Design a protein with these regions (language model features):
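Bacterial N-terminal signal peptides
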Residues: 2-12
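Intrinsically disordered, low-complexity peptide-like regions
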Residues: 13-14, 395
Length: 510
């Protein structure tokens, strides 16, 4: 059996090593070539090293090796208090197993002592490596049902090996609902690692979402997990299954057990990114997004929902409830703009947006939304007065100027509407911005009624310089206008206290 020397050397040549935390012992597991597994098991006074390849089956009493697949082998070395013993087992051509036994460096006869040594250590090998788990799970379940399997898992000290048995149990055995409930409670109670809990659950979530009892047990199980990262993996894998609408909603609601808004968002986004998605699902996501604390992540979910081509009116209006929970003016604006660009919005949505603007702190973002609303002719004509009144809440004359200028230049206003806008201009504090607006509208060839309103607004300007600038801009138009306009021009001009500035405008009509 020349493979023995090679095996000893191979124990030190491994890549893709991963550390496995044991409950009471140090265990490391590695792969050397994708097929060969090496396990080192250190328990203070003793050390066991195991290397194997292929499929290995043990006898029903777990005291010997029943068979090894062609080309496979198992090498076991145990060192205790300085004494080293080794066993190498390989398959013969007739299907039997050939054993080699060594004490120290000397090969010994395969006799009763060797068989007893193998019988003494083989159960530890089994429970340390997970070798032969499929056959053992089948054997225990056939003889004693679920309890027999779980009793054996209780004897395993490694989460890594425990999850192997539990996964096989879920994959291969015809578990009823009571058994699934029991497994759901057992897994987080007996496995410390969220990673391995996830390995058990992630491919079998559809079984747990089949009934109310199993769903409740499953949700209680993932609530006991500390890592939102691993909870999100389980839930996203569940969404990949062919679940009913009711089960899918349960998966979405299960995301509430996570504290992390990031991971909640990844779960909701997983579903929203699907090509086919019923209104019921979108509506549920929108409702759940109202509980996302982070404005950034809430906005991601809401904008994805708005991108859906079949968003129902109910879901769309539920978006407004979710937006009401967004504190950031930046993210509120992002969501509102996505709404306005997504579809023809209802009156309720427009009214909610206008109401929400009253609570915004940022003049910049309030201005962005108001300008978008005025860009929609249907909205601006119906809600002209309401939108114009929102300008009063803007503290910055700079942003008020942006809005009022846009209205005067781009809206098809009647004379009454024009007067209302100029009333807002007259109420501004800054003479500079008043003049900016009035000079721009004078360049737009206003009619006589509009020109009269402009001159009246100019009367609200305190600065002689700025007042004269507006009157100079109106000079050519006033000369060919009505007596009423000329009289208004003279009336405003006479309020200029500076002879210099008065002289610049008096010649326009004298």
């Amino acid at each position: 059996m020349g493979v023995a020397i090679a095996l000893i050397a191979m124990l030190s040549i491994t890549d893709n090593a991963q550390a496995q935390r044991s409950r009471s012992k140090s265990v490391s597991i590695s792969n050397s070539n994708g097929r060969t597994r090496t396990i080192s098991h250190n328990n203070g006074s003793q050390k066991m090293e195991i290397e194997y390849e292929g499929e290995i089956e043990f006898t029903d009493d777990d005291k010997s090796i029943k068979s090894i697949s062609r080309g496979g082998y198992i090498y076991i070395r145990k060192t205790q208090f300085g004494s080293r013993r080794e066993i190498i087992a390989e398959p013969n051509s007739d299907g039997s197993v050939e054993f080699e036994y060594k004490i120290g460096r000397k090969t010994q006869e395969w006799n009763q002592e060797a068989e007893e040594f193998l019988a003494d250590i083989i159960l530890e090998v089994i429970r340390t490596t997970g070798i032969g788990a499929e056959g053992r799970v089948e054997r225990f379940y056939s003889k004693g049902g679920l309890d027999a399997v779980l009793e054996e898992v209780d004897e395993i000290r490694s989460d890594y090996v425990s999850q192997i048995y539990l996964r096989i149990l879920l994959e291969d055995q015809p578990l009823d609902n009571k058994e699934l409930v029991k497994i759901a409670g057992y897994v987080p109670r007996n496995l410390d690692s969220d990673h391995y809990i996830t390995e058990v659950f992630k491919d079998h979530s559809e079984k747990f979402f089949a009934t109310d009892a199993t769903t409740e047990a499953f949700l209680e199980a993932i609530e006991r997990m500390d890592s939102d990262h691993y909870v999100s993996i389980i839930l996203k894998k569940a969404l990949d299954e062919d679940l009913s609408n009711a089960a899918t909603i349960k998966v979405l609601q299960a995301a509430e057990v996570m504290d992390s808004d990031h991971y909640k968002t990844t779960v909701f986004s997983e579903l929203l990114d699907r090509r086919e998605l019923q209104d019921e699902m979108i509506d549920e996501i929108v409702k759940l997004s109202a509980d996302i604390d982070s404005d950034h992540y809430a906005t991601i979910v809401l904008k994805k929902a708005l991108d859906r081509p079949n968003l129902s009116d109910k879901a769309f209006e539920n978006l407004m409830t979710a937006v009401a929970n967004i504190d950031s003016d930046h993210y509120t604006t992002e969501t509102f703009r996505a709404m306005l660009g997504a579809r023809e919005v209802s009156d309720k949505v427009v009214e909610t947006i206008i109401e929400k603007m009253d609570y915004m702190d940022s003049d910049h973002y309030r201005t962005v939304i108001i300008k978008d609303l005025f860009d929609d002719r249907g909205i601006s004509s119906k809600y002209f007065g309401d939108l114009l009144n929102t300008v009063e809440n803007i503290g910055s004359d700079h942003y008020s100027t942006e809005i009022l200028t846009q209205i005067l230049k781009e809206q098809d206003l009647d004379d009454a509407g024009y007067d209302k806008v100029l009333d807002k201009v007259a109420g501004m504090d800054s003479d500079h911005y008043k003049v900016t607006i009035l000079k721009r509208v004078l360049n737009g060839s206003p009619n006589n009624a509009q020109l009269l309103s402009i001159l009246k607004t100019a009367g609200s300007i305190g600065s002689d310089y700025y007042k004269s600038e507006v009157l100079k801009g109106a000079c050519d138009m006033v000369g060919d206008s009505t007596d009423e306009i000329k009289n208004e021009f003279r009336s405003v001009a006479k309020t200029i206290r500076s002879d210099t500035y008065y002289g610049r405008v008096a010649r326009c009509i004298d």
